[in-house]
Amino acid sequence: MKESSLKAKTAKGLFWGGVGNGLQQLFNLFFGIFLARLLDASDYGMIGMLAIFSAISSVIQEGGFGAALINKEKITQEDCNAVFWFSLSAGFCLYILLFLSAPFIAGFYGIPELAPLSRFMFLGFLIGCTGTVHGAIFTKRLMIKEKIHINLIALFCSGCIGLAMAYCGMAYWAIATQQVSYMLLMVSMLWYKSPWKPTLQFSAAPLKEMLPFSIKIAFTNIFNQINQNILTVLMGKYYTSRQVGYYTQGNKWMMMGSSLVTSMVTNVAQPVLIQVSSEVERQKNVFRKMLRFVSFISFPAMLGQIGRAHV
């Protein structure tokens, strides 16, 4: 019974993950095409220059503790409170630091407009830190369908806001507001739908317990974000914002296909593998099945791309 229940949850999670990520990519495609017609490449370039600061700050404030919560067999109110207050405190401190550093960031790129833009954009990760625990709980409980609904609503509403502002000539502020409003809407709905709410109690003991696992995740994610964004920083320093915009947009469209498969699997893999962590052979079997599933989707897609390529 337990085996069939896990299979059903996994299949349901993969199904909704696939449907949700597919719709998400369609929304991104729709809004991306219309925004590209209303905005200049330099607007995207200015947003891209700031991406590394938001991305690394988001990783640091989360500290790998979101993944650590998912990794625990059972989580308590004390665990969730510890991660929530750590994430909120770290996020607030990082925002203050980046707020004060905004003129230096603008000076590094030689674009004064980046100072007020960065201070507004960095609100996104500050808002995001209040939803770290709620998102982890949704993933741990394999509430993929509910999470997808929230994500799609936030994506659609924020996309409409971005389009309206771009139509009114707000340039790069349209993209920045789209990103911040997306985070605000998503976190608000996570709070509304989540069965967990924080309390004022705090203990550092759960953080110490999870630290050996979370620190590895945090460092991995930091290096991953540096690897993904360092070229944009260098281009922003030595090239124009328009050229950076062409690069960031091209890279974004290139990554859409691969992110469709990876996001679908990663949202399900960790919580499922944790449920069978006490049974090594069963865990290996689950991993093999997920690997076959990814191969079943990825290999035909890659062969199709090879067939379409011009010789």
Q: Predicted regions: what is each one?
A:
Residues 1-29, 67-70, 74-85, 114, ...:
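N-terminal membrane topogenesis motif
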Residues 1-6, 10, 145, 188-233, ...:
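Interhelical loop/hinge segments that connect adjacent transmembrane helices in multipass membrane
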Residues 6-65, 90-102, 154-163, 178-186, ...:
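Signature of the first transmembrane helix
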Residues 7-8, 68-77, 127-151, 168, ...:
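Membrane-interface junctions at transmembrane-helix termini in multi-pass inner-membrane proteins
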Residues 22, 29, 85-110, 116, ...:
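Alpha-helical transmembrane segments of multi-pass membrane transport and lipid-handling proteins
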Residues 56-57, 96-100, 110-137, 148-156, ...:
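Alpha-helical transmembrane segments of multi-pass membrane proteins
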Residues 59-77, 139-140, 250, 254-298:
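Helix-loop junctions and terminal segments of transmembrane helices
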Residues 115-122, 150-195, 212-213, 220, ...:
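Hydrophobic alpha-helical transmembrane segments
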